[in-house]
C-alpha cells in the first residue's frame, strides 16, 4: 500500500509495474512459506504450551531450514527468468516492451526480499505460539516506518542514478522486510536460548552453494538461447535450474531434498486400486 501511494507520483506505469511485480514475488512466498508455516503452527503451539522449548527450537529450525532451501532457488529463478516470464505472459497490445521492462525491473528488487518475506511467515508464528503478538506488531510498525523512509530515499536516488525510480520502492520494501526478519529472529533466538545450533546456517550454506551452481547454468542457458523464443528460454531455464539445484542438494546429502524425492517416488510407484 505504501509503495503504491508513493508510486502515484512517479512516471506513468509505475503503479501497475510494482503491483504486478509484487504479486509475482508473493506467489512463491505463499506456496513455500505459508504452507510450511501453517503446517508447523500446531506443533509450535503444542510444544510451547507444554514448555518443551528444546523441541520447539528443533521444530523451528527444521521449518526455517525447509523455507531457506526452497526460497533461495526461487529467488534466483525470479531474478534471472523475470524478463522471459513477463514478456511471455503479458507482452502484447497495450502491454508494451517498455511495460515488460518496468515490471521486470521492479520484480528484480522485490525478488531479493523473497527469503526475508518467507522466513517471516515462520518466525511470526513462533511468536504467536509463545502467546506473544505484541513483539511482531511492534517490529512490524518499525519496519513499515522504515519502508516509507526508504521508499522516498531510494526513489530519489534511483532517479539521480538514471534508473527507473519505481525500482527504489521495491528495494525499500526488501530492505525493510530483511531488517524486520533479522530483528525478530534475534529476539526469538534470545527468548528460546538458541535456534537449533548450526542447522540453519548450514542450510543457508548448502542452499547458497546449490543456488550458485544453478546461477552458473541459468546464465549460460540464457546466453545460449538469446535468439530463441521466450517459452523455450523460460521453461528450459526452469527445468535446468530445478535439476541442477536438486543434484547439488543430493550431492551435499541434504536430508530435506532426499525426503521430498522419496515421497515423490513413493507416490509415482503407488499402484492404483482396482
Predicted features along the sequence, with ranges:
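Membrane-embedded alpha-helical bundles of multi-pass transporters/translocases
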Residues: 1-274
Amino acid at each position: 500500500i505504501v509503495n503504491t501511494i508513493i508510486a502515484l507520483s512517479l512516471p506513468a506505469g509505475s503503479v501497475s509495474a510494482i503491483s504486478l511485480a509484487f504479486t509475482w514475488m508473493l506467489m512463491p512466498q505463499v506456496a513455500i512459506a505459508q504452507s510450511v508455516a501453517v503446517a508447523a503452527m500446531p506443533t509450535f503451539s503444542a510444544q510451547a504450551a507444554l514448555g518443551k522449548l528444546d523441541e520447539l527450537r528443533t521444530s523451528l529450525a527444521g521449518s526455517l531450514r525447509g523455507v531457506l532451501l526452497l526460497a533461495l532457488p526461487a529467488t534466483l529463478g525470479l531474478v534471472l527468468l523475470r524478463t522471459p516470464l513477463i514478456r511471455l505472459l503479458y507482452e502484447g497490445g497495450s502491454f508494451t516492451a517498455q511495460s515488460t521492462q518496468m515490471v521486470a525491473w521492479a520484480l528484480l528488487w522485490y525478488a531479493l526480499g523473497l527469503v526475508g518475506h518467507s522466513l517471516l511467515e515462520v518466525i511470526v508464528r513462533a511468536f504467536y505460539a509463545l502467546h506473544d503478538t505484541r513483539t511482531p506488531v511492534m517490529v512490524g510498525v518499525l519496519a513499515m516506518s522504515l519502508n516509507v523512509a526508504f521508499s522516498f530515499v531510494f526513489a530519489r536516488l534511483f532517479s539521480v542514478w538514471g534508473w527507473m525510480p519505481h525500482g527504489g520502492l521495491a528495494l525499500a520494501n526488501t530492505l525493510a522486510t530483511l531488517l524486520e526478519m533479522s530483528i525478530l529472529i534475534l529476539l526469538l533466538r534470545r527468548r528460546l536460548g538458541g535456534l537449533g545450533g548450526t542447522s540453519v546456517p548450514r542450510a543457508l550454506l548448502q542452499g547458497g552453494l546449490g543456488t550458485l551452481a544453478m546461477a552458473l547454468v541459468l546464465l549460460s542457458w540464457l546466453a545460449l538461447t538469446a535468439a530463441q523464443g521466450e517459452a523455450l528460454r523460460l521453461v528450459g531455464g526452469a527445468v535446468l535450474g530445478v535439476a541442477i539445484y536438486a543434484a547439488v542438494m543430493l550431492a551435499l546429502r541434504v536430508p530435506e531434498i532426499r525426503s521430498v524425492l522419496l515421497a515423490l517416488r513413493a507416490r509415482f510407484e503407488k499402484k492404483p486400486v482396482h
